């Protein structure tokens, strides 16, 4: 089934100039980049995006990190885009990620793990809408 999903290239990967390699891996996997923007989140924007984690002990650290430098937000489209992007990312903890996945290759820690991806279609819809309006997405 054709799906859209949302990805963020996180501050650690952007600062290490890995954006091009990660975008190339997205396309090489057969997913189509239909929207893209680079921005520097404020702490409040990061908190709004990660509001689902507000009560978790790592929330402040996560929002500090996600607002520490530029990120690249991407909308991906393709057959089964959500699970395909999650498989390409690998496990959240880079130490546990399968070899060859983006987090195994580029992740530095549980938090600085290079990339974010939506965990379900419903989450993807919220996350895409948080950063993009319909005019910014071109199939």
UniProtKB/Swiss-Prot annotation:
Keywords: ATP-binding, Cytoplasm, Kinase, Magnesium, Metal-binding, Nucleotide metabolism, Nucleotide-binding, Phosphoprotein, Transferase. GO terms for biological process: CTP biosynthetic process; GTP biosynthetic process; UTP biosynthetic process. Its cofactor is Mg(2+). The keyword Glycosyltransferase does not apply. ATP binds at residues 10, 58, 86, 92, 103, 113. CDD domains: NDPk_I. It comes from the Bacteria. Its EC number is 2.7.4.6. The active site is at residue 116. The keyword Phosphoprotein applies. It is found in: Cytoplasm. InterPro entries: NDK-like_dom, NDK-like_dom_sf, Nucleoside_diP_kinase. One of its GO terms (molecular function) is metal ion binding. It is an enzyme of class 2 (transferase). Gene3D superfamilies: Nucleoside diphosphate kinase-like domain. GO terms for cellular component: cytoplasm. It catalyses: a 2'-deoxyribonucleoside 5'-diphosphate + ATP = a 2'-deoxyribonucleoside 5'-triphosphate + ADP; a ribonucleoside 5'-diphosphate + ATP = a ribonucleoside 5'-triphosphate + ADP. Belongs to the NDK family. Major role in the synthesis of nucleoside triphosphates other than ATP. The ATP gamma phosphate is transferred to the NDP beta phosphate via a ping-pong mechanism, using a phosphorylated active-site intermediate. Homotetramer. This is Nucleoside diphosphate kinase. It comes from Desulfovibrio desulfuricans (strain ATCC 27774 / DSM 6949 / MB). The gene is ndk.
């Amino acid at each position: 089934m054709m799906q859209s999903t949302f990805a963020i290239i996180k501050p650690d990967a952007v600062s290490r100039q890995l954006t091009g390699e990660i975008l190339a891996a997205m396309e090489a996997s057969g997913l189509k980049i239909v929207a893209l923007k680079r921005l520097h989140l404020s702490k409040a924007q990061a908190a709004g995006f990660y509001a689902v984690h507000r009560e978790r002990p790592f929330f402040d650290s996560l929002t500090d990190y996600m607002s520490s430098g530029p990120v690249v937000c991407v909308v991906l489209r393709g057959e089964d885009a959500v699970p395909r992007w999650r498989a390409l990312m690998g496990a959240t903890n880079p130490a546990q990620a399968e070899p060859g996945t983006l987090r195994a290759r580029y992740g530095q820690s549980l938090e600085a793990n290079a990339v974010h991806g939506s965990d379900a279609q419903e989450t993807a819809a919220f996350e895409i809408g948080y950063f993009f309006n319909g005019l910014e997405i071109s199939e």
